[in-house]
Amino acid sequence: MAELTISANDIQSAIEEYVGSFTSDTSREEVGTVVDAGDGIAHVEGLPSVMTQELLEFPGGVLGVALNLDEHSVGAVILGNSENIEEGQQVKRTGEVLSVPVGDAFLGRVINPLGQPIDGRGDIKAETRRALELQAPSVVQRQSVKEPLQTGIKAIDAMTPIGRGQRQLIIGDRKTGKTAVCVDTILNQRQNWETGDPKKQVRCVYVAVGQKGTTIASVRRALEEGGAMDYTTIVAAPASDSAGFKWLAPYTGSAVAQHWMYDGKHVLIVFDDLTKQAEAYRAISLLLRRPPGREAYPGDVFYLHSRLLERCAKLSDELGGGSLTGLPIIETKANDISAYIPTNVISITDGQCFLETDLFNQGVRPAINVGVSVSRVGGAAQIKAIKEVAGSLRLDLSQYRELEAFAAFASDLDATSKAQLDRGARLVELLKQPQYQPMPVEEQVISIFLGTGGHLDSVPVEDVRRFETELLDHIRASEENLLSTIRDTQKLTEETEEALTKVINHFKKGFASSTGESVVPDEHVEAMDEEDLGKESVKVKKPAPQKKK
């Protein structure tokens, strides 16, 4: 039988190998205990080194955010289902602040405020992650707004223009078409996207906060049918989500958009709507026992929106020249724009489009109130062609509204007032636009030129929209060079204006009104003097005097 021999060296090497490969499963981590939980809020004892807005891990993989850092406990907002969180459960620190995955893979997808896909189309491979709470670009990192962002809506592009990097508030009562205005703006970016030019392309982010699930689905369907989901990301926090998700959703959308902005690209973000975010934040703050202020909102509700909207900017050329344009939506009650949240957001943004219930019910859609709507910086970004034709549009409409109220009581109006009323009625009709049908800027120029140039004065009010539609169809079919000239030069030169007037006058000859009458204006005839009215004039032909013989 062979003798088994083990040397001391073998034993030593085996022990060294075992010790070298040994790993300890123990780790040092802070663990807290749930003291109480309910209504999407949990109070946790322990965790002395936790950071503000740090992610906490609850049992079952549920995440929370540390908001209140008290002396002996932490107030956390639970992100997700909080029904299974009970007193006495352990809570772990993650050591990470809130962040979301970002990148081009998110285009065409629907995600929740944690960046997780919820459209059933599989996982998303992100390029990198971005923190939700980031400092907005400083004054030095910005430049003035100078490039237009066309909405495709005549009333906005002509009178309250929006530039890339601007924040334009869309404000109004419920059911006045606020979402439709923003969806139209997203749809209007398709033409730029199809050019493939990075300087023209605009990526879009639609943030739905507290909306019904059916509303979000209908918006997504409208974007898909319009071919806009190719360049759009939807961040959804529907009404069924917890208050924590509704509070975070706008910051998630901003993080996704800022990634592209700092990459030198142009982005449009829609917050629909910030009123519901403020209400969710109010609920969180009251449950965390923070002292309430005006309308029971916490003292930092202004900062909630200002730090969000200040991220919209036009970056300097040194940082790539990217831009982030914001369209926040605020819902008012009974057209009261002097309430707390509306006045806050009006003071933060660079202008507002005020949508009015009365105008909407009268059939004026989009129901934009010209008198209250304003754009503080977009005028510098407006193209020259629009600026030339729309120069008098706001004044004409304002005078029309004043005269309209006066004419309701006055029976006898002078000729000038009647002419202003007639022109104003046609302009109002001209600015009406169907939903989900944005108009290219060159066609807007022609449309507004019709109204401000007086070419519609002889067209009956009920035929104005049909005249506009048929004229644009005619120009697309046989005068395409006119559209391309305006599109390329972005100006309305004298030659183009003459050619356009010639086309309009020629088209009028073949256009019949709904009553069958011609819309060609009668030739101008000089009026008789007042003293000559009612007098008969008789021409007597006198024979020529005969010469004396």
From Swiss-Prot:
UniProt entry tagged with the keyword tRNA-binding: no
Protein origin, superkingdom: Bacteria
The reaction(s) this protein catalyses: ATP + H2O + 4 H(+)(in) = ADP + phosphate + 5 H(+)(out)
UniProt cross-references to NCBIfam families, sorted A to Z: atpA (TIGR00962), PRK13343.1 (NF009884)
Family: Belongs to the ATPase alpha/beta chains family.
Function: Produces ATP from ADP in the presence of a proton gradient across the membrane. The alpha chain is a regulatory subunit.
Cellular compartment(s): Cell membrane
Site features described as Required for activity, chain residue numbers: S373
Protein name: ATP synthase subunit alpha
GO cellular component terms listed in the entry, alphabetical order: plasma membrane; proton-transporting ATP synthase complex
